[in-house]
């Protein structure tokens, strides 16, 4: 049953997690094809808002050609006597949840990476104007966040206006992110958990600390504190830290307890500052990811905005598939830009001394936070294009990773795998003569067996 019977499409939690494929798409808003897209919540005074007003700047949904994509911005202005500026980021993040409540609407990512799709069926049912979406969002916000007394929504598809407001939004995001810098995890006895993405990754939970932003890059420790106070039963909540098991890896008794509960026992331990062992899980909304390059014993890092291939031939979509889903996969680690600015970034793995490649856009955004002497030794896509060139570059720059190469990198070595023989008794096979024995040989085994040979051992 829909939450709002007077609207042309259903609205409810049942639609959260719905995926819309290209062939079913009426229109795409933002996404990887568009340079400029954003979502922003601003807290302003009560007398500045016309409560319930929805404004469209540019083409409305009915004016956008079928199957096309458009630059997109959404600005939500809120006001209330109890509304703090600290709540802006969390109210903003709720857009991910609320848009996905709408039948036939898909919302992915956050901030300047948003990606929305509307399907044809919902459009034909009457969701053919941003006015309808705006009405839904305003009702959801007011019904779940009682501290919002007034709200108005502005949708933007005009390319020039999107670009103008996008540039302002970037400045606001940066101001928010700067608040927690200088704080240490050891300064607090409470972290925060965020389960907003569990509709897409049921076993995932973000652990937010002063030195580890949410993977999406949209929720800081201060944001978590503010929202848990006004909405204690909501998707952002306190995590009592408890005893520190290992300060280097970032493992805590309290975090493990909550992770086990929220993942229904699927994830038992999490270490916040390593990509191996028990790494922090990821949904698909992370700003970027760190990926291990075994040939060089180091990490590459990239963000969603990078369009090309990495130095080992993978792209963001491929790496995202390997990283996301609420799993713990050694060597694949969902991260935010702000976490890359943290002194605890991949701390247990060697930090920036283990990073061997990144796009130049990331290098620009973390300059002034990561050690400059290391940034000077880490190449970008402008410097190298394959692993052989990367190896040469690292040697020329005397990158610290070079001193860990006690022998040739793995790709240069001939790997020999001993034959594995299993007795036939361990492999009962129906339909074969009794008394026949077999030898099972796995040749060139790595992760998968290249060849399976079954030999008869008659007479032995």
What are these regions (language model features)?
Residues 1-414:
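Cysteine-centered metal-binding/redox modules
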Residues 412-460:
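Compositionally biased, non-globular sequence tracts
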């Amino acid at each position: 049953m829909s939450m709002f019977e007077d609207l042309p499409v259903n609205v409810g939690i049942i639609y959260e997690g719905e995926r819309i494929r290209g062939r079913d798409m009426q229109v795409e808003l933002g996404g990887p094809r568009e340079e400029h897209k954003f979502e922003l919540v601003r807290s302003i005074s009560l007398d500045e808002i016309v409560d319930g007003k929805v404004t469209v700047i540019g083409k409305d949904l009915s004016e956008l050609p079928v199957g096309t994509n458009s630059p997109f911005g959404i600005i939500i202005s809120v006001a209330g006597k109890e509304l703090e500026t600290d709540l802006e980021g969390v109210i903003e993040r709720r857009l991910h949840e609320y848009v996905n409540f709408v039948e036939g609407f898909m919302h992915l990512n956050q901030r300047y990476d948003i990606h929305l799709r509307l399907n044809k069926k919902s459009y034909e049912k009457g969701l053919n104007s941003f006015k309808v979406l705006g009405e839904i969002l305003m009702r959801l916000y007011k019904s779940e966040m009682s501290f919002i007394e007034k709200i108005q929504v502005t949708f933007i598809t005009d390319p020039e206006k999107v670009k103008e407001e996008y540039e302002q939004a970037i400045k606001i995001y940066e101001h928010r992110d700067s608040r927690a810098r200088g704080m240490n995890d050891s300064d607090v006895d409470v972290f925060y958990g965020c389960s907003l993405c569990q509709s897409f990754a049921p076993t995932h939970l973000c652990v937010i600390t002063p030195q580890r932003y949410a993977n999406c890059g949209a929720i800081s420790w201060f944001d978590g504190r503010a929202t848990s106070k006004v909405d204690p039963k909501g998707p952002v909540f306190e995590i009592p830290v408890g005893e520190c098991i290992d300060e280097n890896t970032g493992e805590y008794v309290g975090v493990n307890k909550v992770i086990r509960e929220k993942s229904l026992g699927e994830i038992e331990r999490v270490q916040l500052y390593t990509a191996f062992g028990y790494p922090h899980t990821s949904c698909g909304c992370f700003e970027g990811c760190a990926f291990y390059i075994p040939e060089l014993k180091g990490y590459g890092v990239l963000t969603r905005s990078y369009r090309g291939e990495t130095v080992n031939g993978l792209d963001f979509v491929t790496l995202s598939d390997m990283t996301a889903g609420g799993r713990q996969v050694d060597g694949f680690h969902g991260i935010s830009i702000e976490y890359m600015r943290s002194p605890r970034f991949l701390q247990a793995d060697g930090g920036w001394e283990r990073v061997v490649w990144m796009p130049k856009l990331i290098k620009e955004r973390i300059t002034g936070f990561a050690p400059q002497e290391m940034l000077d030794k880490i190449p970008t896509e402008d410097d190298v294009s394959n692993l052989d060139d990367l190896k040469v570059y690292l040697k020329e720059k005397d990158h610290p990773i070079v001193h860990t190469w006690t022998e040739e990198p793995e790709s240069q070595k001939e790997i020999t795998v001993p034959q594995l023989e299993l007795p036939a008794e361990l492999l009962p096979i129906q339909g074969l003569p009794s008394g026949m024995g077999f030898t099972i040989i796995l040749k060139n085994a790595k992760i998968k067996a290249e060849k399976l040979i079954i030999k008869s051992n008659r007479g032995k």
